[in-house]
């Protein structure tokens, strides 16, 4: 009898286990960034009582066991809207959580979450929870983002693609947006094949969104005291009513600055040595007007549309008194330059969440830019220049994403076209130019996660057609090129808090119009430049190994370049207008670099920040004075920054960096270090925000000092710019206005978190 009972019990247990199913999925935020520690609850469909619960791992993945054919899952995370999903399959795909905000009248609520989150290939910075939101413009923030350098390059080498609210944008457009309207910035150093192969990584930038039926506005003024003066005034209006949100910012800047450049050139000839030195002081004045407008419309739960506009109008004046010496003979002259420029850029986007596993999106944009510059040099004979250009750029991208049991699939098609016309006048020598360029292509990417392992592979195809011509050189470029760019990313979870990864990809750097145009451009009394129509695009193969443990990330990258484009000086025996040094871009067949980087995010009580370091070793050889010259001097870079909440109304921040100098291809840079200090204080119940910043406190930024050697010419540059400055910014928050009588309330869960 006991045996029979035992067999029955075993049979029932086996039946239960056989009937059980394992439900799996992945949770991401609105920017497809994996969300760890999200609560996943299995609820009873009849009365929503809790059956069991789990949390997602650091990659946003969860597994929960169920004995029912139909299941109700609830996803919750503090600061995000609860998400419910009924499922009958084992794989629920990707769950996208939507963030909420809290508005409490008369109460100052301070969040305690960290400002920086790190994963194997991404650095996420919460700008809205950092002093960075008060710095000025988006470009001021980017200079202080871990993983980026002060000139907007990736720390591990290469230029990123900037994406604002899903639209590819430029640094010029980002300079129009106040930092106070930025919510989050993500640096992705190993992106998929979706974005341009001309850039190595992607920087995602997201603006803020208000609660429904709310209007807010802010007025700010920033003054920069350096050798001269700069003043920036910005007005921001952010509004959301029902399903439509609008963001408008207008700004005006007045700039007055001075930069001192000292250039030396030494030419070693068989019979003599020619030494030239030039000191140029550039006194600049400028007036800039910026405008940015963004509109988002939630058509329904699945569909949304958006519109963006960026406008920029500027007028600049430069006066450059110059002293040039060649073999003891001095020549003093001045140059005056006037510039007028305006740019208008618009884009529309549409997003359709077809169902929980499929998404379709479309983006189209158009940009028009016009520039007109005049110049005068009081040398003998007098030189007058006049240049004008008009640029039209249009593009579109259609993307489709779906999550399947066998893999996640992303694919799309894209195209863009650019046309420009213009003219350049040097005294009586005139050159008219016309360019047409078209880029079309497609991409697809597959990704799969299984047993702590992640695999993503993709392929991008681009075809580029160019027609470049001038009235003096005729049609000097008429070409069509096809390129395929493979992409592979592999990740493995070693423990709950650590992972390792490998990524392989390729990028391309195409020569610009000025690189290809054989026409002359005059530098100074002894130098001129020409383009090289024979230039080939540079293809770079990138291999990266990464390791991440909690708040520490380290990577080693090997970049191999084929046909690297470098502009070099060459001595010509036959002079042109008494000028014998010709600068011309050429292709270097082979060059490579190894870059090792490390980022650590720390938190010490009220102080949190990050420590960043990198080591770069180039491998390139050139000819100098008849011998093979190796340019392989390594360089070190180290930076540390932090913010310290002194009280609930004040904060102190610092950031410093050291660059040991070293070779960048053929340019040997000098060492440099900087220190910036920032103090922020809120006044009158957060109505006023005062920010005081000291940039380059010790005036030690020599980042533009370099020496280059090639063939029989040695040239150097020493720049003394307006890097040391005092910034005083005062912002006035005009407050928030409810647009209807329905009060917004924060959930208890959210309040408990803050």
Show which residues each predicted segment covers.
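Short, acidic Ser/Thr/Gly-rich low-complexity loop/linker segments typical of extracellular
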Residues: 46-61
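Outer-membrane beta-barrel translocator/receptor signature
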Residues: 196-203, 211-262, 286-289
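N-terminal periplasmic accessory domains that precede
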Residues: 90-96, 106, 110, 138-141, ...
């Amino acid at each position: 009898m006991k045996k029979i009972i035992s067999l029955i019990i075993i049979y029932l247990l086996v039946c239960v286990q056989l009937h059980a199913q394992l439900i799996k999925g992945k949770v991401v935020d609105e920017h497809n960034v994996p969300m760890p520690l999200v609560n996943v609850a299995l609820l009873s469909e009849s009365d929503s009582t809790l059956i069991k619960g789990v949390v997602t791992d650091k990659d946003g993945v969860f597994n929960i066991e169920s004995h029912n054919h139909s299941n109700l899952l609830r996803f919750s995370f503090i600061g995000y809207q609860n998400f419910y999903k009924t499922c009958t399959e084992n794989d629920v795909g990707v769950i996208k959580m939507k963030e909420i905000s809290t508005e409490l009248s008369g109460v100052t609520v301070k969040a305690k979450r960290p400002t920086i989150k790190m994963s194997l290939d991404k650095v996420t910075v919460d700008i809205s929870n950092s002093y960075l939101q008060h710095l000025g413009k988006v470009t001021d923030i980017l200079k202080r983002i871990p993983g980026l350098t002060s000139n907007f390059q990736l720390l591990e080498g290469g230029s990123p693609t900037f994406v604002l609210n899903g639209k590819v944008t430029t640094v010029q457009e980002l300079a129009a947006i106040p930092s106070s309207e930025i919510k989050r910035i993500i640096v992705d150093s190993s992106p998929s094949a979706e974005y341009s192969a001309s850039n190595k990584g992607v920087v995602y930038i997201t603006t803020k969104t208000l609660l429904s039926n709310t209007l807010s506005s802010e007025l700010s003024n920033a003054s920069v005291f350096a050798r001269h003066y700069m003043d920036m005034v910005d007005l921001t209006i952010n509004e959301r009513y029902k399903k439509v949100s609008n963001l408008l910012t207008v700004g005006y800047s007045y700039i007055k600055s001075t930069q001192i450049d000292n250039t030396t050139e030494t030419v070693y000839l068989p019979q003599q040595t020619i030494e030239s030195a030039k000191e140029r002081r550039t006194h600049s004045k400028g007036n800039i007007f910026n405008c940015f407008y963004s509109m988002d419309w939630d058509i329904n739960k699945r569909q949304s549309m958006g519109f963006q506009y960026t406008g920029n109008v500027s007028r600049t004046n430069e006066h450059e008194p110059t002293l040039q010496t060649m073999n003891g003979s001095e020549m003093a002259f001045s140059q005056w330059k006037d510039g007028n420029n305006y740019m208008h850029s618009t884009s529309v986007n549409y997003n359709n969440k077809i169902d929980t596993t499929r998404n379709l999106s479309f983006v189209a944009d158009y940009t028009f830019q016009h520039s007109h510059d005049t110049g005068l040099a009081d040398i003998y004979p007098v030189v007058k220049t006049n240049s004008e250009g008009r640029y039209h750029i249009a593009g579109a991208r259609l993307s489709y994403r779906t999550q399947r049991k066998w893999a996640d699939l992303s694919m799309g098609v894209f195209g863009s076209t650019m046309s420009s016309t213009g003219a350049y006048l040097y005294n009586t020598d005139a050159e008219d130019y016309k360019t047409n360029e078209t880029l079309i292509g497609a991409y697809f990417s597959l990704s799969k996660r299984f047993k702590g392992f992640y695999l993503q592979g993709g392929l991008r195809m681009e075809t580029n057609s160019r027609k470049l011509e001038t009235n003096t050189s005729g049609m000097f470029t008429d070409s069509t090129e096809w390129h395929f760019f493979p992409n592979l990313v592999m990740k493995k979870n070693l423990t709950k808090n650590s992972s390792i990864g490998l990524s392989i990809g390729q990028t391309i750097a195409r020569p610009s119009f000025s690189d290809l145009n054989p026409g002359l451009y005059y530098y100074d009394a002894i130098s001129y430049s020409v383009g090289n129509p024979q230039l080939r695009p540079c293809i770079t193969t990138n291999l990266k190994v990464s390791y991440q443990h909690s708040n520490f990330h380290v990577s080693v990258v090997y970049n191999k370049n084929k046909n690297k484009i470098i502009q070099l000086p060459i001595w010509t025996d036959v002079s042109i207008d008494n000028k014998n040094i010709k600068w011309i871009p050429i292709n270097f067949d082979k060059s490579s670099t190894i870059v090792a980087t490390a980022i650590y995010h720390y938190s010490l009580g009220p102080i949190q920040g990050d420590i960043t370091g990198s080591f770069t070793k180039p491998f390139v050889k050139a000819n100098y004075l008849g011998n093979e010259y190796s340019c392989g001097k390594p360089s070190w870079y180290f930076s540390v920054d932090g913010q310290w909440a002194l009280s609930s109304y004040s904060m102190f921040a610092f950031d410093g960096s050291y660059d040991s100098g070293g070779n960048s291809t053929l340019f040997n840079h000098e060492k440099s270090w900087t220190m910036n200090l920032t103090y922020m204080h809120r006044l009158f119940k957060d109505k006023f925000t005062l920010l005081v910043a000291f940039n380059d406190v010790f005036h030690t930024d020599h980042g533009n000092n370099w020496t280059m050697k090639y063939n029989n010419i040695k040239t150097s540059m020493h720049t003394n710019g307006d890097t040391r400055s005092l910034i005083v910014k005062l912002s006035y928050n005009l407050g928030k206005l409810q647009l209807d009588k329905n009060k917004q309330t924060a959930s208890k869960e959210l309040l408990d978190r803050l």
